[in-house]
């Protein structure tokens, strides 16, 4: 059942390509809302392997607006995306607010960190998505060597756009009591 006043995003990432030459239509997503407003904020960054700093493709990146320290093991993410072949990610259509961000190699696909074999990454601080209206240069070429026109165009830049997460596997060990020690004190 759809939630009222909620933005939903279908993220095709790199799954659409043309029929003849197999050129990939990258980063395509479709958003719709059950209310009058479509949330439009974005955050982006890169996910690296903590051991060798190699990019990690195909890993789920998620946001939690519940800032409790145990939310990532109890609740599913409120917004998600996946990393591309270069470990890059963008989470789109975010509601304004404060979030914790996580990366999760989600073995059982429940959008929670709940299996000993799942890799995880996180920031130790919160993120607050924002934007600024700015300009950039756009070049029109006559051919591959000759510039026709350089125009200044406006665009929206979203922040943070340089998040770096490092994925690691938690060393899961059972805790055992090695040596019990009881202390008794007498009233003074």
Where are these regions (language model features)?
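N-terminal targeting or signal-anchor segments and their processing/structural boundaries
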Residues: 1-186
